[in-house]
């Protein structure tokens, strides 16, 4: 399911299935086994996982695990997470933005345009409070606050058969051929959707107030609906990101999206499959906080509304069997094995 130009697996990557064998080989055997290639399998969504307390090293390791990526000089849109004026993990960490931009430039991209529609205030105001304009100037990024786009730069996405009453409006530049890279955080979400990762980050590409359907409040429709999780997934039919980087160095294990209980997995995930990366993210959140009081623990991973609907819409991997974890070391492989187990398991029965 690779969707990147010249995107190939790294020969040194370790899959979860390989790890199960290698764990019994000892240090020497593990080093030797890493030189081999995995047996031929059915197509999988590649999901790179890196663990490192140093953010830049974790980002670099995860992205390098995905192998050779060449954007062919194409201009890119970059969707990070600037939903509120609160610091990471509520919003994108400035070091993450800087590291990802550096990686994209090393992989032969053209101009990079950072786009956003913040949910908890004016995008420009939130950017100012977070110091985004200054950082964008240092990184030579174009900035586009979607709140300020005129009507002629929006288009209607009808989404037939969805839970949206009259579809949605998205910027004209956004379609399934757009070269868009996404940086998402990982957190629980107490206002709806239960969790926020890649699928939910796409809501920041949808108009709050209609330009073509003048004055219509799309976000009121979303947040008042009992089908909010499904609607979040349905928005993702409007486009297909070429690459997603999930910064889970810190997460909100409860609360969210702007504040909550902090946990520190020190993990970065990268993939071209937003469903696979969100499934792994949900599993990672469940590791941070066990027990039925954690809403994510009450359903199996793929029974979460966002992921269930995303799988129905064929937006990405539909089970752990369609994912292939790539890791660089035994520590990462052990975590990947844990995550895969959580993704596969059924929820515990209520007592």
Spans of features found by a protein language model:
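N-terminal and secondary-structure boundary signal
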Residues: 2-351
């Amino acid at each position: 399911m690779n969707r990147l130009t010249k995107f190939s697996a790294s020969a040194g990557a370790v899959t979860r299935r390989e790890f199960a064998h290698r764990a019994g080989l000892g240090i020497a055997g593990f080093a030797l086994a890493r030189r081999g290639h995995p047996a031929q399998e059915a197509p999988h969504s590649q999901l790179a996982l890196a663990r490192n307390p140093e953010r830049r090293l974790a980002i670099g390791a995860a992205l390098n695990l995905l192998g050779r990526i060449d954007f062919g000089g194409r201009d890119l849109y970059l969707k990070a997470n600037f939903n509120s004026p609160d610091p990471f993990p509520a919003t994108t960490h400035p070091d993450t933005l800087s590291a990802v931009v550096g990686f994209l430039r090393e992989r032969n991209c053209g101009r990079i345009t950072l786009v956003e529609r913040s949910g908890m205030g004016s995008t420009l105001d939130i950017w100012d409070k977070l110091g985004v304009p200054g950082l964008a100037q240092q990184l030579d990024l174009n900035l586009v606050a979607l709140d300020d786009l005129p009507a002629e730069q929006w288009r209607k996405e009808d989404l037939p058969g969805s839970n949206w009453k009259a579809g949605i409006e998205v910027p004209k530049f956004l379609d399934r051929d757009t070269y868009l890279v996404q940086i998402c955080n990982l957190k629980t979400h107490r206002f709806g959707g239960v969790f926020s990762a890649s699928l939910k980050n796409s809501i920041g590409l949808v108009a709050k107030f209609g330009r073509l359907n003048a004055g219509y409040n799309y976000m009121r429709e979303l947040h008042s609906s009992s089908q909010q999780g499904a609607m979040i997934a349905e928005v993702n039919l409007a486009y297909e990101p070429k690459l997603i980087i999930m910064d889970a160095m810190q997460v909100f294990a409860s609360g969210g999206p702007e504040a909550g209980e902090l946990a520190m997995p020190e993990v970065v995930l990268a993939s071209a499959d937003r469903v696979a990366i969100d499934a792994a993210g949900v599993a990672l959140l469940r590791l941070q906080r066990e027990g039925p009081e954690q809403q994510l623990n009450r359903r199996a991973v793929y029974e979460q509304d966002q992921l269930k609907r995303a799988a129905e819409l064929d937006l990405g991997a539909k089970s752990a069997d369609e994912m292939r974890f790539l890791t660089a070391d035994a520590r990462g492989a052990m975590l990947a094995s844990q995550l895969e187990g959580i993704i596969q398991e059924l929820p515990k029965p209520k007592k």
